[in-house]
A protein has these predicted regions:
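Oxyanion-binding/catalytic loops of NTP- or PPi-dependent enzymes
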Residues: 1-75, 79-85, 94, 101-493
């Protein structure tokens, strides 16, 4: 039986895990470390570096080093590296490729399939980009699961008692809150909320600003305007942040950071926590939205699990305990728990006996644009939800629509993501035409079917009821991820 590995493709760090027996998953080391920096670079001789070596060269060669690429997933951009330019999917594929290679060495066999985790609040484009990165790395991505869900699998696998668990997942670049119900090995996600641009990187930025401002006032030099100085500051701040998780004070000391100027600053944990408190309040708003969607009060929660390296900041646990009245749990390393859960899901899909079954949800509503009434007036911008957020996956829903005028033969189907009453206020996902409808009077019946699979990938079918004429499109593959584009990206790599 071939192993299906579990991968946590993170903003700051990435991990890979597998389950070879019915015991606990094992985290596979990469160059001797269980945590690999999600960093890609090119050295001065043009050689590709991934992981720790790439991060180590960041200060000396910042122009040729890329960090936090996860925050750009789903964007149609390219980033220069060496004498080429790469998409976020291509950069991520280098990270996945390094993890794959390490696993093959460790296991002594080919690794061809993987379960990859994403933030619960990743949209369709970001999920599709993650899948494409896996393909470019030579992996068959058999499942994409949400990070909080993976954490629940790892933490609660095999426990029989019924529990309601809040997963608080604060990573390097993203935040998710998910409410999970578990009973008799069934892991069912009830609701999710989050922010795909809130995490430890934002804490680093606040800390960098706090340190750089006094230096600028004293010397008239903006450390953040000098690329090498800015990267030295970033590395020093990241180290200080980790220190403040365990100690009340941290010192940032960088000699000759610019010319003959030195940086020497002491920061207290109290100062740092006051800086990040407004961002953590935003996470608590998401937590309460998550509870509201599931129609639970805080007292209904049995356990809180902390996930992600940024939860090591003591203020996180204090805020949660003060607000929810429950002391959070972090018995399993918060950096590793997601990869371990993905490995459990991978083992289940490979046919191995596992003690948990996953029932995941979509955190988003998907729908279409139609003509209708809004605030007492007719408009062609009414949003009609088809799949509601927090629906269990996989899910398929069908709604009935009508042609607008006699002999209408073409219809533009537009798909949006969101919950606002007007389509234009939601996120546009994609569109397509269905042409050649029969010449009929206005009111010709059109069936619109939306299907969302377990990976959160959306398939849309529009069909004329009278004739059966239909067109089906998998959203996000019309413009990207096609075989031709993948081959172009493979050749670029």
């Amino acid at each position: 039986m071939k192993i299906i590995v579990g991968i946590d493709l993170g903003t700051t760090n990435s991990e890979i895990s597998c389950l070879r027996t019915e015991g606990r998953p094992e985290v596979i080391p990469v160059e001797g470390e269980t945590i690999m920096p999600s960093c890609v670079g090119i050295d001065h001789e043009g050689r590709l570096m991934v992981g720790r070596t790439a991060k180590n060269q960041m200060v000396a060669n910042p122009e040729q080093t890329i960090l936090s690429i996860k925050r750009r997933m789903g964007e149609k951009i390219t980033l220069p590296l060496g004498d080429k330019a790469f998409s976020p999917e291509e950069i991520s594929s280098f990270i996945l490729g390094k993890l794959k290679s390490a696993a093959e060495t460790y296991l002594g066999q080919k690794v061809e399939k993987a379960v990859i985790t994403v933030p619960a609040y990743f949209d369709d484009a970001q999920r599709q980009a993650t899948r494409e990165a896996g393909i470019l790395a030579g992996l068959d991505v058999v499942r994409i699961i949400n990070e909080p869900t993976a954490a629940a699998l790892a933490y609660e696998a095999g426990r029989e008692e019924k529990q309601r668990i809040l997963i608080y997942d604060l990573g390097g670049g993203t935040f998710d809150a998910s409410l999970v119900e578990m009973e008799n090995g069934i892991v069912e996600v009830r609701s999710s909320h989050g922010d795909t641009h809130l995490g430890g990187d934002d804490f680093d930025r606040l800390l960098s600003d706090h340190v750089a401002l006094p230096f600028k006032k004293k010397y008239g030099i903006d450390l953040k305007s000098d690329l090498k100085a800015a990267n030295r500051l970033w590395v020093a701040v990241e180290k200080a942040k980790r220190t403040l998780s365990d100690r009340p004070f941290a010192t940032i000391r960088e000699e000759f950071i610019v010319g003959d100027r030195h940086l020497d600053v002491e920061i207290s944990r109290e100062e740092y926590e006051e800086m990040i408190r407004p961002l953590l309040r935003k996470t608590m708003i998401a937590v309460h939205s998550c509870l509201k969607d599931a129609m639970f009060l805080p007292k209904a929660i049995d356990k809180i699990i902390l996930v992600g390296g940024s939860t090591r900041t003591p203020l996180v646990a204090r805020m949660l305990e003060d607000d929810m009245g429950i002391e959070p749990h972090h018995e399993i390393n918060p950096d590793l728990i997601v990869a371990m859960g993905a490995a459990i899901q991978g083992a289940a899909m490979s046919g191995a006996k596992t003690k948990a079954i996953l029932v995941d949800i979509t955190p988003y509503t998907f729908g279409t644009r139609a003509i209708g009434e809004y605030q007492g007036r007719m408009t062609s911008d009414v949003y009609v939800p088809v799949i509601k957020r927090n629906s269990a996956l996989p899910v398929g829903k069908e709604e009935l629509f009508y042609t607008n005028y006699d002999n209408q033969q073409d219809i533009l189907v537009e798909i949006f993501q969101g919950d606002e009453p007007l389509a234009s206020e939601n996120i546009f996902i994609g569109n397509f035409w269905i042409k050649g409808l029969s010449k009929a009077k206005a009111g010709n019946l059109i069936l619109l079917n939306l299907e969302l699979d377990v990976n959160g990938i959306l398939k849309v079918t529009a069909k004329e009821k009278a004739t059966g004429l239909a067109r089906t499109v998998t959203m996000d593959t019309a413009n990207k991820g096609t075989g031709t584009n993948l081959e172009e990206k493979r050749s670029n790599i």
